From Swiss-Prot:
It comes from Staphylococcus carnosus (strain TM300). GO terms for cellular component: cytoplasm. The active site is at 145, 169, 238, 241, 264, 273 (o-(3'-phospho-dna)-tyrosine intermediate). Belongs to the 'phage' integrase family. XerC subfamily. The keyword tRNA processing does not apply. Pfam families: Phage_int_SAM_1, Phage_integrase. InterPro entries: CB (IPR044068), DNA_brk_join_enz (IPR011010), Integrase-like_cat_sf (IPR013762), Integrase_catalytic (IPR002104), Integrase_recombinase_N (IPR010998), Integrase_SAM-like_N (IPR004107), Recomb_XerC (IPR011931), Tyrosine_recombinase_XerC/XerD (IPR023009). It comes from the Bacteria. It is found in: Cytoplasm. This is Tyrosine recombinase XerC. Residues 1-84 form the Core-binding (CB) domain. The keyword Cytoplasm applies. GO terms for molecular function: DNA binding; tyrosine-based site-specific recombinase activity.
Length: 296
């Protein structure tokens, strides 16, 4: 890793507020690129468009998914753009390289019956049971990311509205409302919160030692719930986020509103959930239209 690449990563951290996970991906992309340069006896500054095409072929030869290749090329394009701001003799060899098209996939989600089964499994009694229910209520009821969930502090809650303030990607703040069931679960949980708090902090969700729960801890909680729920498998925080978006659209929420609630920058990111919702539309159509009922 050379100085200009280190400066690039530093800029992403302090100016664009990239997460540790994203920064690691950018770092690994640059390390892989440097290894390619060394193997092919190429120089960073004299790297040309034809070399960029060869690198693209190299990535595909590794059997990588198109989404992964697209991200790696995007990293290098951004790096050279940054370098150009520092040195006007630098040319971006990736600027004309066409992005490989991303695979299209439908997000996995739970049906409403499955969500009901999950909630029925959680014992809303005692601190652990109440906490686990709050985790499930917030992830499904607001669609927030697990990273946003574990960073919720008491001051972020508004039990009057009710809703919660979270800090999303790019340090962007947003407020998400939630329903009465979620509010009641939080209120019951908070009644038992002060006695078990033996570490000074103001985070909402804690483990058995009173310390802030981690993302790994949340995943453990969800897996434990699924193990005790008949007919439900394969749970993870993002699947609950997918479920939130899908159910909102199925019940008539407009795409822009869901985009705002999820904290998506691009509407196209939210738009993938409409493909899932179209399944519900077709179900309604088949049940309602006289000429369509025969298609069943």
């Amino acid at each position: 890793m050379n100085k200009i690449q280190e400066s690039f990563l530093y800029m992403l951290k302090v100016e664009r507020f990239f997460s540790k996970h994203t920064l690691k991906s950018y770092h690994d992309d640059l390390v892989q690129f440097n290894a390619f340069l060394e193997h092919e006896h190429l120089k960073l500054k004299s790297f040309e468009y034809k070399d960029a095409r060869n690198y693209l072929s190299f990535l595909y030869s590794k059997g990588l998914k198109r989404t992964t290749v697209s991200r790696k090329i995007s990293t290098l394009r951004s790096f050279y753009e940054f370098w150009m701001t520092q040195d006007d003799t630098v040319v971006n060899p990736f600027v004309q390289l066409v992005h490989p098209k991303k695979e299209q996939y439908l997000p996995h989600f739970f049906y409403e019956e499955e969500m009901s089964a999950l909630f029925e499994t959680v014992e809303a009694d005692g601190h652990k049971g109440l906490r686990d229910r709050v985790i499930l209520e917030l992830l499904y009821g607001t669609g927030i990311r697990v990273s946003e969930l574990v960073n919720i502090k008491l001051e972020d809650l508004d039990l009057n509205s009710p809703g919660v303030k979270v800090l999303g990607k790019g340090n962007k703040e947003r407020f998400i409302p939630f329903g009465n069931m979620c509010r009641e679960s939080i209120e019951r949980y908070l009644e038992l919160f002060p006695p078990i708090q033996n570490v000074k902090h103001d985070y909402l969700l804690v483990n058995i030692n009173g310390r802030p729960i981690t993302e790994r801890g949340v995943r453990y909680v969800l897996n434990d719930i699924v193990k005790r729920t008949a007919g439900v498998t394969d749970i993870h925080p993002h699947k609950l986020r997918h479920t939130f978006a899908t159910h909102m659209l199925n019940e008539g929420a407009d795409l822009r509103t869901v985009q705002s609630l999820l904290g998506h920058v691009n509407l196209s990111t939210t738009g993938r959930y409409t493909h899932v919702s179209n399944q519900q539309l077709r179900k309604v159509y088949l049940n309602a239209h006289p000429r369509a009922k025969k298609e069943k």
